[in-house]
């Protein structure tokens, strides 16, 4: 690669990262998206088609129409994608009057002040689902852990369930990036038990204040730890034999129910107390 090509490659990578454009070229991800389409849609929304990888692979298997959006007009579309049918726009800013039985996508992964753009895409698409509609997205695995996603996840679980998840445990599925991703199928149907087929294994989905975890066994979330235990926040001083001192201690900490223990607390050394200074030497 000559200097000019190297410079172009650096610019291209910077552009790709700034836009969060990681195209779905890997066949395992494409196949999973197709397999997760369990409804029989006539029209599928794809809010960020990129080159059109997902549209092409789904069109090869299913006879459906697509509502296609893309913000970047500079992307070279794949053969088979009709440019005239692509709505070039900022998906987050346009109003869509339709609701959909099926929405698929690989949204942009771009950090924002409030979290990440892919979470905003999920939020908007969730609200564009019909009852019993399915949302099938490829996203970073941190989606279930991010504080910025807790409110959305809590709302989604209140009216539906993540029925299928494919986690390939492979960070090399995109060019120019190492990202741990998963494919999820969410169904806006709250009539069934919160069971998830996770990498083809049956798991029980647990949602607590927007934090999603999975268990091999069913867990009763109606009872709290406080129903069984007295819970207190502990304190570790680092050296009990030095800082725990009934004579020189200047703060009291709850060490047991109705029992307090005195500890030495200073924010700098030497302190204003000569006896404490001598003790700590």
Which residues fall in each region the model found?
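Long recognition/docking surfaces used for binding and targeting
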Residues: 1-8
